[in-house]
Amino acid sequence: MSNYKNFINYFKRSDETATLGLGMLVSGLILFWLGWSIYWIFFYIGVPLIPIGFALYIYGTTGRADENELKKIIQENTDAITFEDVKNSAEFRKRIPNSPTEESFGEYVFNTNVLMKKTKSGSVISSEYVCAKMLILNDAFLVRTYAFSFVANKTQKSEIEIPFASVEKIEMEHVNKRYMLNNKELATKASALVITHDGVKTRLPRKDDIYADEFVLKLNRLIKINE
């Protein structure tokens, strides 16, 4: 990914700029027509609105990415995390179930070092993202993560194997935080699957949907079966 500037513009420019520009452009054209055909004063009101509105619209829509591009990159990076090397490895052959299960995770990263934006849908996103996948073995969880930035050449890969025997607890964690953006307070909610093992906690970002609790129960049952 090399178009960092477009993503910087996406996070820094307001979505309302293009909307305002389009509104001014349309209003200017209508007033221009009214001034030409009905009353001259509308002409002089509409004429300056046209170039200003056009400039704002161009500024708000060009040279910047959009939400669909973010989603595309997220999907590409998530798909790039695979376990084909593990599945084809003689070392892991006996530890992989006949029908291995893979689970995907991912969420935007929120801290004071990222750019944040409130989307048109009302959700809050940031300029950094972490995606992960978990391969459930017969005796352990194998987790691979990939964290990256939309606005800079910043990436980080990691891998951890968590033996079932070392797991103390699996649960969902919810954290509410507030940040300031353009003098406005933004509320964010981060959810994660937390696996406590060997006295440490491994957090995998996961949306708190209707399947979250069911997934936690599934993993806990798996741990008990293999005790």
Locate the predicted segments by residue:
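Hydrophobic alpha-helical transmembrane segments
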Residues: 18-22, 32-51
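Anionic N-terminal interaction surfaces
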Residues: 2-17, 51-134
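Acidic, Ser/Thr- and proline-rich intrinsically disordered linker/docking segments
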Residues: 154-227
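Conserved beta-hairpin
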Residues: 124-156
